Each structure stands twice: as structure tokens, then as C-alpha cells.
């Protein structure tokens, strides 16, 4: 039904109307919350360790969460590290997880972390960045050093534009184009670069170094700290929805997806379960 009238008057009257709390009651979202809890229990977060022994980025963020805790403020850039930070860091306070959502703003984390530190100087602030994002705004490390913002940066370096690489792996048969950011030696040397910009910086390459490095960074509070975590290039973000498909087609892992509604009931019959097992066995052969 259209509302025709002077915008100022109409909006004022609508505001007055809805300000009367007895006019509108918020709908209960408990059924939806219960549904989400059920899905989280049935499809818990997880990741695979890399066969080649390289560091898993999910482990880095999981350890950061356990070490720095939920009282720290976490800010992310854009890409795989953004998704992993959302999944593997435990948040229980409002305004402690800052990112730009789906806006695609590579380079967001360092300036935003500086803003968070300026607003709440008593808080520990971690910028979680990828090697691609970091090269968009790493010069602001100098600003942080000069202006006295001792932020901490967890630099997840997989030597690639990881989210683009994942799409090329899954949907373009592994034909990689313009995603590799280095060769045998990663370029630039992020430790030397960060030190030149006024930060303390060090590199982590194995799982047994992660917690100690994070704790070391937490103890430095007179300047920015950049911790470079060199991780495997083939780690992927799950769950995922392919372009042009419905949210109902979400995949929990490659080739695996949960069922919803009537599909869910049908998929849980013994016949359907046996069919799934047989299909997986044939695929494995």
C-alpha cells in the first residue's frame, strides 16, 4: 500500500506511532536461534592439518583466541583470513569483532585497528591480515608507530591471494592466474618491511612456535608488532556457497552439503545413507 504525503510529516508521524511500545511487539526469534544452535552442533567447525607439515592458518587464529582471549578487540581485512577469524576466534562481547563484511575493502584492518585503539586505548587490539591485504595499507604501520598506537598484527602469509586461489581451485580446475604473490622466497620480506616502518616484527613457521610468538607480541606495548605466520597455500574456507547458487546449496566441505527441510528427512533414511556411503566409496576408488 503506497503512502502519499510530505516526507517530513509522514516520517514524523510514523516515528511517533512506532515509539508507542505497546503498538509493536518484537517477534520471537527463539525458534531461529534454536535452529542455528542445532546446525552448529551437527556441523561443528574444523579443519585438516596439512600433509606437507605447513602451518594451518585456522590453528593460528584458534590459538590467538585462546591466548589473547575474548576481551581483546579483533579487526580483519578481507579474504580467507577474514572468514577464519570469524569462525575460529570466540567472541562474547559486542564491538570486539570489527570487519567490513562483504564490502571487499582490502586493507581495512590496519587503519580500523588504529581507530579501535584510539577509541579504547586500554584494550589489546589485533589486526588480522593476509599478505595481499597487508600490502594495501602497510604504510599505516608508520602512522601507528609515530602516533603511539601499539596495535598488533597477525599477518597470515600463504603467498597468495587466497580467496581467489580457492575459487580457481574449486571452479576453474586449478588453473591459477595472477594469485601467486611470491616465488621460492616470499616478496616482500614482511619482517624487514615492518621493522623499517617502525614495528617490532618476527616470523613463525611451525605450530610449536605460535603460542609463544603471540604471547611475546602481547608483552610489547610501546610500538606496533607484526607477527608473520607463514602458512600453507592450500587451506580453504568452509562452508562455502558457489556463485549463482542458492543458500540452500551451501557446502560444508568439498562435495558435501547439509540438507534442509524435506531433503533433510529424506537424507536420513537408511536407504539414503547407504547410497551416500556407496557414492563416496566409488569416488574414493
What annotation goes with each model-predicted range?
Residues 11-22, 36, 40-47, 65-68, ...:
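Structural signal for hydrophobic packing residues in well-ordered secondary-structure cores
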Residues 1-33:
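Glycine-rich, acidic loop regions that bind phosphate or pyrophosphate groups
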Amino acid at each position: 500500500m503506497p503512502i502519499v504525503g510530505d516526507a517530513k510529516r509522514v516520517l514524523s508521524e510514523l516515528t511517533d506511532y512506532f515509539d508507542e511500545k505497546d503498538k509493536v511487539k518484537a517477534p520471537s526469534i527463539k525458534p531461529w536461534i534454536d535452529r542455528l544452535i542445532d546446525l552448529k552442533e551437527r556441523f561443528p567447525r574444523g579443519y585438516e592439518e596439512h600433509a606437507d607439515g605447513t602451518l594451518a592458518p585456522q590453528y593460528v587464529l584458534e590459538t590467538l583466541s585462546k591466548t589473547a582471549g575474548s576481551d581483546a578487540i579483533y579487526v580483519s581485512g578481507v579474504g580467507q583470513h577474514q572468514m577464519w577469524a570469524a569462525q575460529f576466534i570466540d567472541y562474547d562481547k559486542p564491538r570486539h569483532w570489527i570487519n567490513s563484511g562483504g564490502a571487499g575493502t582490502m586493507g581495512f584492518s590496519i587503519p580500523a585497528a588504529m581507530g579501535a585503539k584510539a577509541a579504547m586505548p586500554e584494550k589489546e587490539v589485533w589486526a588480522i591480515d593476509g599478505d595481499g591485504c597487508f600490502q594495501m595499507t602497510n604504510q599505516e604501520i608508520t602512522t601507528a608507530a609515530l602516533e603511539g598506537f601499539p596495535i598488533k598484527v597477525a599477518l597470515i602469509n600463504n603467498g597468495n591471494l587466497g580467496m581467489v586461489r580457492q575459487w580457481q581451485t574449486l571452479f576453474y580446475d586449478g588453473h591459477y592466474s595472477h594469485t601467486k604473490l611470491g616465488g621460492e622466497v616470499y616478496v616482500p620480506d614482511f619482517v624487514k618491511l615492518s621493522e623499517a616502518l617502525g614495528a617490532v616484527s618476527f616470523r613463525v613457521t611451525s605450530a610449536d612456535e605460535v603460542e609463544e610468538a603471540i604471547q611475546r607480541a602481547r608483552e610489547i606495548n610501546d610500538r606496533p608488532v607484526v607477527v608473520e605466520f607463514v602458512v600453507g597455500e592450500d587451506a580453504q574456507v568452509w562452508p562455502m556457497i558457489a556463485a549463482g547458487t542458492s543458500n540452500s546449496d551451501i557446502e560444508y566441505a568439498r562435495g558435501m552439503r547439509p540438507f534442509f527441510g524435506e531433503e533433510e528427512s529424506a537424507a536420513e533414511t537408511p536407504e539414503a545413507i547407504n547410497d551416500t556411503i556407496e557414492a563416496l566409496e566409488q569416488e574414493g576408488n
